[in-house]
A protein has these predicted regions:
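Structural/interface elements that position substrates and couple domains in central-metabolism enzymes
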Residues: 1-184
C-alpha cells in the first residue's frame, strides 16, 4: 500500500520507517529541506535504536522517500497519516500545523477520484479530529465523510524503544468513522 506521512518528527519518522520495513511504499513529507535531504541520504534526524540501519535498508529497497511539502503537494496515497507537532510556548496545544495540513489534504481529496483515508497520529485533544480536521476537509474539498475516511490512531512510543513499541505494541487504539479506514 502507498502511505504518505506528513511530519518527520519522532512519530512520523519511526512510523514511516517501520511501515516501509513491513513492505509498504512510504513517503514522508516535511517543510524543512535539510531534514528531507538528511533522510534521503540515510541519516535519521532523531536517535532511536536500529533506526539508522532500518532507514538504510528501506531506502535501498526503494520503499521509503522523504519529500518537501508544499501547497501543490499531491500525496498519491490511499492512506495519509498526519504526524505534525502541536506544541506551543504556552503549554497548550497549538493546532496551526494541523489546520494547514488539513487544507492541503482537502485539496488532495478534492482532486482525487479514489477513496483516501486520513489518520491522525498527532497529539490532539478529544474531538479535534472530528470537529477541526473533518470540518476543514469537508469545507475545502466539497466532499463529506464517507467520500473520504477519517481516523485517529494515537501513538504510544517511548524514546529509546520506539521501534520495538511500534512493531510490537502493547495496545492499539483506533478511532474511526468507517470500515474502509479501519481496514487500512
Amino acid at each position: 500500500m502507498k502511505v504518505s506521512i506528513i511530519g518527520t518528527g519522532y512519530v512520523g519518522l519511526v512510523s514511516g520507517v517501520c511501515l516501509a520495513s513491513k513492505g509498504h511504499d512510504v513517503t514522508c513529507y516535511d517543510n524543512n529541506h535539510e531534514i528531507v535531504d538528511s533522510l534521503n541520504n540515510g541519516v535519521p534526524t532523531i536517535y532511536e535504536t536500529d533506526l539508522k540501519q532500518m532507514l538504510t535498508n528501506v531506502l535501498k529497497e526503494k520503499r521509503f522517500a522523504a519529500k518537501l511539502i508544499s501547497n501543490e503537494t499531491y500525496f498519491d496515497s490511499e492512506l495519509v497519516i498526519i504526524a505534525v507537532g502541536t506544541p506551543s510556548d504556552r503549554g497548550e496545544i497549538d493546532l496551526v500545523y494541523i489546520k494547514q495540513v488539513s487544507i492541503l489534504l482537502a485539496n488532495y481529496i478534492k482532486s482525487n477520484e479514489n477513496f483516501v483515508a486520513v489518520v491522525v497520529k498527532s497529539t490532539v485533544i478529544p474531538g479535534t479530529t472530528d470537529t477541526v480536521i473533518r470540518g476543514i476537509i469537508e469545507e475545502n474539498s466539497g466532499k463529506t465523510l464517507g467520500q473520504f475516511g477519517l481516523g485517529m490512531n494515537p501513538e504510544f512510543l517511548r524514546e529509546g524503544s520506539a521501534i520495538d513499541d511500534f512493531m510490537r505494541p502493547d495496545r492499539v487504539v483506533i478511532g474511526h468513522d468507517d470500515e474502509k479506514t479501519l481496514k487500512l
